[in-house]
């Protein structure tokens, strides 16, 4: 993403890699310092896909320096909450956006959407 190679690693559900910035054990974390997404190896099916899309949202925010925008527009005490809200929005509604675009544009959506999204965030 934006020239950064991200890695995805599956780890034990009790791994220290799954402890987030607030000290909470979660099912996945993203470490921008190492460009790594850590996923619990107990995840599967639709929940795995949902969590992965959420974590890819964190990758996008870090890769395109969008966290700086959050930090500029939101009080510091809300930075983490806003970042999580954005990634939840992507995970919860991103698929719907692509599905609707595909229904409207057909196969052209597969060519047009990635280009337009890249243009919007670069």
At which residue positions do the language-model features occur?
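Active-site recognition of the HExxH zinc-binding catalytic motif
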Residues: 50-62
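Metalloprotease/metallohydrolase-associated module, dominated by Zn2+-dependent proteases
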Residues: 1-47, 63-122
